[in-house]
């Protein structure tokens, strides 16, 4: 038990090292997964670690009534089988790189269908209860509290669903930088070599699953052609032969002439603006001329300004307003006089009628 608690299982063991943060894989990366030889001799019972520890103790039947005896019994089973589980999970994995890469490539090449369900990959004839290495259906209480915590996305080695294949991808960095992807794959337990193992894939190149950034989108249309001067300036320091320089000098004018003949000349912004300004100036002059002619006509209607040749617009408006008030008063006075004359006319008609009756 003490040996299992303090014995390290990998070469170059470093407690403070976090190999998930590594972004530069090397040829010796799989040496991290080269396991130290097991502390016991690998004999006929090496494939099944349960046989090397002897027969399993029978399930307790008469301990349901006494809680203290049950707790002591569970502690004894915990001390016995925790070591067995750790040995089974740590010493029965891959020890070389080629079988691991072959298994992963086969698994990823086959791929899961769209309607993937983990139960489709389970073997119907296989009974986990009969396997000595799978203790989940026999000891659910012991395996419910794992001793060693795995990473947040990977499953614990003592998971009860051993016959299922689960692939989990973990992304630790942003899309713009290189990031390792941790994949946990669980294979069939019927094969003694296929057990839970962890691999770390470092993405060195472009992540093809990531969306394209906006600046990398392809622009529609043909690219703009370089002017002849810029083309000559860029090609001159290249150190090419004289013949190539002559070809470069002669080609751009032909392309420019073809482009000018095919494409119509666009209207320049200055010409457009000048046309708009010219039309606006014409309308403004017309408005001012109409206004001036109207003011001159109004000045001629006002008797006080008829003899004045140069009068401001404000003076014309003031005198015209006063003249309108005078005309309104004269009209009212004339209307009153008209009513008086109408009244006198009626009185005279009545008098004529009275005198004609005699």
Swiss-Prot record:
Residues 150-171, 219-245 are annotated as: Disordered. One of its GO terms (cellular component) is nucleus. Residues 227-242 have a biased composition (Basic and acidic residues). Its main location: nucleus. GO terms for molecular function: DNA-binding transcription factor activity; DNA-binding transcription factor activity, RNA polymerase II-specific; protein dimerization activity; RNA polymerase II cis-regulatory region sequence-specific DNA binding. One of its GO terms (biological process) is regulation of transcription by RNA polymerase II. Detected in adult testis. Pfam families: HLH (PF00010), Myc_N (PF01056). It is found in: Nucleus. Residues 274-326 form the bHLH domain. Keywords: DNA-binding, Nucleus. Efficient DNA binding requires dimerization with another bHLH protein. Binds DNA as a heterodimer with MAX. This is Putative myc-like protein MYCLP1. It comes from Homo sapiens (Human). The lineage of its organism: Eukaryota, Metazoa, Chordata, Craniata, Vertebrata.
């Amino acid at each position: 038990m003490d040996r299992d608690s303090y014995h390290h299982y990998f070469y170059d063991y470093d407690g403070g090292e976090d190999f998930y943060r590594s972004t530069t894989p090397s040829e010796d990366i799989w040496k991290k997964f080269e396991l130290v030889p097991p502390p016991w001799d690998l004999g006929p019972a090496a494939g099944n670690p349960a046989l090397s520890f002897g027969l399993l103790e029978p399930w307790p039947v008469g301990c349901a009534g006494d809680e203290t005896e049950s707790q002591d019994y569970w502690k004894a089973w915990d001390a016995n089988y925790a070591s067995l589980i750790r040995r089974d999970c740590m010493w029965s994995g891959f020890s070389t790189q080629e079988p691991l890469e072959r298994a992963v490539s086969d698994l990823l090449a086959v791929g899961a269908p769209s309607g993937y369900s983990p139960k489709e990959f389970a073997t119907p004839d296989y009974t986990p209860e009969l396997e000595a290495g799978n203790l989940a259906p026999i000891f659910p209480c012991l395996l419910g509290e794992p001793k060693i915590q795995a990473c947040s996305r990977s499953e614990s080695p003592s998971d009860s669903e051993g016959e299922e294949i689960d692939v989990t991808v973990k992304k630790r960095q942003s899309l713009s930088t290189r990031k390792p992807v941790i994949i946990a794959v669980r294979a069939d337990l019927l094969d003694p070599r296929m057990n839970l193992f962890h691999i770390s894939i470092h993405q060195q190149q472009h992540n093809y699953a990531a969306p394209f950034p906006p600046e990398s989108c392809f622009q529609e249309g043909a690219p703009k052609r370089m002017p002849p001067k810029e083309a000559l300036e860029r090609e001159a320091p290249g150190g090419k032969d004289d013949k190539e320089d002559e070809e470069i000098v002669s080609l751009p004018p032909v392309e420019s002439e073809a482009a000018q003949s095919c494409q119509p000349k666009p209207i320049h912004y200055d010409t457009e603006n000048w046309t708009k300004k010219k039309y606006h100036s014409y309308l403004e002059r017309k408005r001012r001329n109409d206004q001036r002619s109207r003011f001159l006509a109004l000045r001629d209607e006002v008797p006080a300004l008829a003899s004045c040749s140069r009068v401001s617009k404000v003076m014309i408006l003031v005198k015209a307003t006063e003249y309108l008030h005078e005309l309104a008063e004269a009209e009212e006075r004339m209307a009153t006089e008209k009513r008086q004359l109408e009244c006198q006319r009626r009185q005279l008609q009545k008098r004529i009628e009275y005198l004609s009756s005699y």
